[in-house]
Amino acid sequence: MIQHSIFKHIFKILLSLLATMSIAAHAQYKTLDPNDQNDPDAPRFWEEAEIKIPTAPPSKDLKPFYVSAITQLKFALDAPSITFGKDEVIRYVLVITTPSGGQQVSYEGIRCEKYEWRLYATMQKDGEWHKSVNSRWQLIRGAGHNSYHAAMVKDAFCDNSIPRRSAKEIIPLLKP
């Protein structure tokens, strides 16, 4: 009889944990009716968190990563800029360098769950950041010699469709 009550107690604890995990998994999703937020069966939609465009140029802590054997461009992430939103979006500053030394600096986000990326802003020659006019989520394309988004997602940012949780976890996975 004692064993039965212990198993019953453990079962209740496991059910509570599963319910909590389910609610946490839906945290970045909102319900149409705020009163339904704790209802696991309520229809939900994803909502992107408010973003802040960087105010400074990239740091000197650039982490290069491999994209393709046939690209002439060099790609690097500004390590201190990598952030993890409650909306499950990984945001970062990317620096692309041409063979002649020219650079393109952008602030972007990757959404592992949907295999999408978004350009938020670019840094101009004067060092000022300018918001992207047509910023929208786009599917990541894996083909092409400059498909750096696919390289970041496959090698470092995502574990299948689940985003990694820290820059310390991502940086070692970048293939230089």
Regions found by a protein language model. Name each.
Residues 2-14:
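Bacterial N-terminal signal peptides that target proteins for export
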Residues 20-24:
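N-terminal signal peptide c-region/cleavage motif recognized by signal peptidases
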Residues 28-176:
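N-terminal secretory-pathway/extracellular module detecting exported/lumenal segments
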Residues 16-18:
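Classic N-terminal secretory signal peptides
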